[in-house]
Amino acid sequence: MDFLIIGGDTRNLKLADILIQNGHTVQTMALGEEYSPSLQAPYVIGPMPFTTDGVMLNAPLAKQPVKLNDFTDITKQCKMIIAGKIPKQLRQHFEEQGILVYDYLDYEEINIYNCIPTAEGAIEIAMNTLPITLHGSSALVIGYGRIGKILANKLKLLDVNTVVLCRKNTDHALCEANGLDSIFPYELESNIQKMDVIFNTAPAPVLDSHKLSKIKKDCVVIDLASAPGGCDFAYGKEAGIKIIHALSLPGKVAPVTCANILYKVIAHIIEERS
């Protein structure tokens, strides 16, 4: 099969290699080479996320920026587009052109697999930033969704005194079943000052200026939530608090693993259509 991979990060570079190794023909654009709008292929693979600002294609490795309009021009002749977090209007536009559109985020297995490098990347950041070992330290994990569950379990295995903040009674029961301490949101203020590191996974403003004013001087806050995150970054900067907004960790810490995950999903999509 003939693929054209446009934009994206190191994951898409590695994905190109995997596709070639599996006998496919692959062209790439906006992955370090010169922009070439004449390239065409029936199967187009875009980045994940598709765009970060709604104007430009997410293409951090491109030699020159690629506008979303340029992407739509390139893909006029294609049969299928596969990418992640495609804006609703763009998806509708492609479908009106008769193009089959598949979004990675519609495939739960990708979301689950990506939690592993996200958790490992967050732990790596903590290890490189904290002035103490994670072993024996106190960590707060805010949120007990997919990422929160995997992260909390990995921290526990590193002998970190891990506390999970969650809302649902069922999540508190799961924490207890997994040997984890947990608190409710109303208990955050009385516990936050005990923490050496705080990991936020909740896409909500949970760490406002009042909460941040309570943390220890050397505490590190690692925000894993999608933009705009869950912290008052302006206050944190003003107060000298170390807050790291760690986005797109899978592609940064484990691009080969992530590329293999994407390949499995792409192969599944194409097999379904054949």
What are these language model-derived features?
Residues 45-135, 246, 265, 272:
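Glycine/serine-rich phosphate-binding loop and adjoining beta1-alpha1 elements at the start
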Residues 85-102, 225-269:
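Rossmann-fold NAD(P)-binding glycine/threonine-rich loop
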Residues 22-35, 158-178:
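NAD(P)-binding Rossmann-fold cofactor-contacting core
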Residues 4-14, 19, 135-155:
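Glycine-rich adenosine-cofactor-binding loop
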Residues 9, 32, 87, 167-169, ...:
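Residues in the short beta-alpha loop(s) of Rossmann-like NAD(P)-binding domains
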Residues 3-39:
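N-terminal glycine-/charge-rich "phosphate-binding" loop or analogous flexible N-terminal tail
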Residues 1-2, 78, 135-138, 218:
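Phosphate-coordination loops involved in phosphoryl transfer and adenosine-cofactor binding
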Residues 49, 66-75, 175-250:
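Rossmann-like adenosine-cofactor binding region
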